Amino acid sequence: MKVSRFLHLLLVATLLALPTLSMLAGTPKTAAPTGTFKAFPVNEDFTLNPFTYFREGLLLAAGDREKSNAMTISWGAMGTLWGRPTVTVYVAERRYTKEFLDRSPYFTVMTFAEGDSILRYMGHHSGRDGDKAAALGLHTLYTDNGTPYYAEADLVLECRLLYAAPFDSAAFKDDVPREHYAKRGKAGLHTMYIGEVVRALRKE
């Protein structure tokens, strides 16, 4: 009986130690996703509805190989400006990602085939408190320009920043923006960032 109990306790101790042993061995939380990205001409082969593209939620990322951050966005616009295909995003003053946008010449916007949990986490946690991508087990990749994006995405647009300007409340011409910031403006007014789409990637 004593031998049997000893073996039982030894088995339990071994099972409890496995997570720690895995971390010490450097085992990643998740395996790298399969599939590769292929570039495509956004002016010729982009069929998504621009009026619902942002409403369903995207991830916005900025930074470099040293440090980066991402956040969930649902405001944005797509179109043509100064003869270039452009994406416009809006980021509130107190968002951590804004610090990276303000010092980066490029940013990316991404969609995920199954990204509800990713978008939810990225939207409810701040990168000031820790590495959100690492917490989610996301695998960070970089474009030739050093712009971050995630291997788990299914569509990536890399944008070169052309213009940035904060909203001016004195310029509001209707109660829609006034009421929004009166009720939900704790993070401050938004800054508008317009970027030229310089690279579009689709997961194969």
In which residue ranges do the predicted regions lie?
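Intrinsic disorder/low-complexity segments
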Residues: 1-3, 19, 71
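Bacterial N-terminal signal peptides
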Residues: 10-22
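Bacterial N-terminal signal peptides that target proteins for export
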Residues: 1-11
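Basic, polyanion-binding surface patches
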Residues: 26-204
